[in-house]
């Protein structure tokens, strides 16, 4: 299990968030979290994506909030331990991007 998470400070956010914004991640209004909606060819690809992300999330002991309808997967990331964005969210979002790219 990873060490205690800390909430990203302003400098860390300036360094880490632009790359995620560039690929479609947005900040949740009124909450210290990021989200993105992914679209796939069909339900099987969406479910395969979720399965790969779930396996990694379990390894990291850091789980996304997500919602799936057919070929769409909406993901929100925030770290409950520090009540906001942490490096764990950035790392998981980066992994999620790699998985999504491999399925397109």
Swiss-Prot record:
CDD domains reported in the protein's UniProt record: PCD_DCoH_subfamily_b
Keywords attached to this entry: Acetylation, Activator, Cytoplasm, Lyase, Nucleus, Tetrahydrobiopterin biosynthesis, Transcription, Transcription regulation
Top EC class for this record: lyase
GO-annotated molecular function: 4-alpha-hydroxytetrahydrobiopterin dehydratase activity
Catalytic activity: (4aS,6R)-4a-hydroxy-L-erythro-5,6,7,8-tetrahydrobiopterin = (6R)-L-erythro-6,7-dihydrobiopterin + H2O
Residues carrying N-acetylalanine: 2
One GO cellular component term: nucleus
Cellular compartment(s): Cytoplasm; Nucleus
Binding-site list for substrate: 61-63, 78-81
Function: Involved in tetrahydrobiopterin biosynthesis. Seems to both prevent the formation of 7-pterins and accelerate the formation of quinonoid-BH2. Coactivator for HNF1A-dependent transcription. Regulates the dimerization of homeodomain protein HNF1A and enhances its transcriptional activity. Also acts as a coactivator for HNF1B-dependent transcription.
HAMAP family cross-referenced by the UniProt entry: Pterin_4_alpha (MF_00434)
Assembly information from the UniProt record: Homotetramer and homodimer.
Protein name: Pterin-4-alpha-carbinolamine dehydratase
Organism field: Gallus gallus
